[in-house]
């Protein structure tokens, strides 16, 4: 028998339960299992200098843990894990300078009381595949209430190195009667099962077996049906009691218990449970009694489930129904945003009913009942939805242009965005400015690398990072790159001598505001303009380290290369329909061809540059400009102001007079 431990709880007293051949009472024979104090030997194959400390009191801080561990070994750092409100999560990590210090601290301080609560220390395992594999993990149930973490640890430590040991507790700190022990090796776990399963621990026979996940426990590997002995019965007549329940179900097998659930007044709640001794009897009762009439009621008989199982089953059922509904409405459900505040469900249905049979329309509201600016419209078939998308996308509703797209599930949208962002972040292969004859010129790169000899190589980049690199008005096939903005450090020493290859950047707040309003961008302060690669030597800023240029951001698109042949102006509805099915490159070209002659009426001298700047705006706003001459005139005026402010007094490329 092991001596009492520091916490006042003795290690579990274990005896075999051996039936006597001559008597009905069992004889308890002590088992000679050595229970020394736990000695942990450092495993040099997998050195670990970090410890996990669990079961911490909420008041425990880093300082408390540091003061506790510093007397045993040299502590490098301590971190108590907290939630977003800075409340302790009940565990911490302690880092040491070497694995031997960590093992020594674990051996000396494991289950030491801190704020009257023993702390549970084990090696920190950062590999989730090892932690969650279940290898070497055993389950112990029917534990006596007096057995705590330390007693369980000392009971099982003689079989091998323990990685984790825990007795399950309720919110009040009382034992739930079961626990888990994870060994470093599978052999140690098997030895503990062979020796301790069925033994008496503190006068209670315990079950010790391999840990099996909840999802796997309900099913046997060899049988497709769940294993169960407990049967749930509902829709019972009120006059049915336990005796009648036993009599009704007794024909299927031996019943170990039967109960009818009652309220506080003793009246039947019309459901109960029947527990059989064997699974075959329970399965037979479910098969033959489910749906049988008993009096005026039709019985429901099924396998008794835990609340967590029922919730999981209902969740799967509702999720499958949601997926089925979505698949039925695939392509027929529209997502709308930029809705005017005056639009409600009825008005939304009224607006879209002319394009087909609207099965549902919904404007999303905040908790105060105000519109969140987006909603959904569902049609009976995809053809009607596509017709509505073509006709209504970009249309002015109230004071806002409407944006419409096919609705996506959150999971699909997230997967699409993750794939897009991973493509953006992935470094592309280095390639020069070569391109197939007659094909579109690739857009300007995000980074340009310039070697000592000045030869430039441009990595290809995917679409979607601030501009459309596959097509840029202002770049004819075969031409070099157009205008770019090159960031430079804001705080630096004044430089002497001429700066080559740069226009003077804007320096006042008004210009930044106009640029943001016009182009819907927020360019970082400290940008200077570089006109092509021909100005100056290599187009290099002397403030940038030689050999590497910082990220290059495109200036407003120069539309000088848009075909000057006057394309016939299309009605907005027809143009919107064409844009919906066009690729991004064709979409920009089509918008440019329609916008160019409209801008030319207001500003024939700088029509190409102004058109390029306007093409940086959202498609819905461009369509609005085409419909509203006053709005177009205002935007053209803003664009000219931005161009006028950004021009150098000594530059005459734009044809502005500095005295204008």
Curated annotation (Swiss-Prot):
Residues in domain PABC?
571-648
List the record's Gene Ontology CC terms alphabetically: cytoplasm; nucleus
Q: Tell me the ranges covered by the RRM domain, including all copies.
A: 49-126, 136-213, 229-306, 332-409
For this protein, the record's InterPro entries field holds: Nucleotide-bd_a/b_plait_sf (IPR012677), PABP-dom (IPR036053), PABP_1234 (IPR006515), PABP_HYD_C (IPR002004), RBD_domain_sf (IPR035979), RRM2_I_PABPs (IPR045305), RRM_dom (IPR000504), RRM_dom_euk (IPR003954)
Which protein is depicted?
Answer: Polyadenylate-binding protein 3
Entry superkingdom:
Eukaryota
According to the entry, what is the taxonomic lineage of the organism?
Eukaryota, Viridiplantae, Streptophyta, Embryophyta, Tracheophyta
Asked if the record carries the keyword Iron-sulfur, the reply is no
Q: What's the further remark here?
A: A.thaliana contains 8 PABP genes.
Name of encoding gene: PAB3
Q: Which Pfam families match?
A: MLLE, RRM_1
SMART domains cross-referenced by the UniProt entry: PolyA (SM00517), RRM (SM00360), RRM_1 (SM00361)
Gene Ontology biological process: mRNA processing; nuclear-transcribed mRNA catabolic process, nonsense-mediated decay; regulation of nuclear-transcribed mRNA poly(A) tail shortening; regulation of translation
Q: Tell me the GO molecular function terms.
A: RNA binding
Compartment list: Cytoplasm; Nucleus
Task performed by this protein = Binds the poly(A) tail of mRNA. Appears to be an important mediator of the multiple roles of the poly(A) tail in mRNA biogenesis, stability and translation. In the cytoplasm, affects both translation and mRNA decay. Inhibits the polyadenylated RNA degradation by the Rrp41p 3'-->5' exonuclease in vitro. Binds with the 5'UTRs of PAB2, PAB3 and with a lower affinity with the 5'UTR of PAB5.
| Organism annotation | Arabidopsis thaliana (Mouse-ear cress)
Its primary localisation, in coarse terms, equals cytoplasm
Please describe the organ and tissue distribution of this protein's expression. Expressed predominantly in immature flowers. Detected in tapetum and pollen. Strongly expressed in immatures siliques.
- Which keywords does the record carry? Cytoplasm, Nonsense-mediated mRNA decay, Nucleus, Repeat, RNA-binding, Translation regulation
What the record says about family reads: Belongs to the polyadenylate-binding protein type-1 family.
